[in-house]
Amino acid sequence: MNNILSNINIIEYNGKYNKKINDFVNLSMHIFIGRPFKQREDLINIQDYYIEKGGNFWIAFDEDKIVGTIALENRNTIGILKRFYVDKDYQRLGIGSLLYNEFETYVKAKTNIKTIYLACGKSLKDAHNFYTKNGWKQINKLDIDMHFANDD
């Protein structure tokens, strides 16, 4: 792949980097889906929202810069893939795949999740292609634009 991948370090959330995570997610949401900057409920306390409920939150770093995130919200046998963003300058380098592999490995090894859902805006064609390539199937519209399911 690219040499950049050798510099990428993916860690599980450890109580650090809260401001950096919030800033990165807000900027990503603004760039990719036009959402305004604000404090996101799940990012106020990642430990309680994700970790304590059997989910997880991963951060990809290039040195000290956050370049990607992905999160798992665990609802017993149902999981929700959330906060999956890669910095626009780092896309198509394999970082999304690295994050997704961490997510998938964790789900299979450490949870009882049978089905995973995610929401994806209609305009995010690259994201749709990524999910389809990774075995996700589009399902009917629920509360927001697009939902995909992966029940492997």
Residue ranges and their predicted role:
Residues M1-N2:
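Short acidic N-proximal helix/loop "leader" segments that mark the beginning
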Residues Y90-G94:
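Glycine-rich phosphate-binding loop
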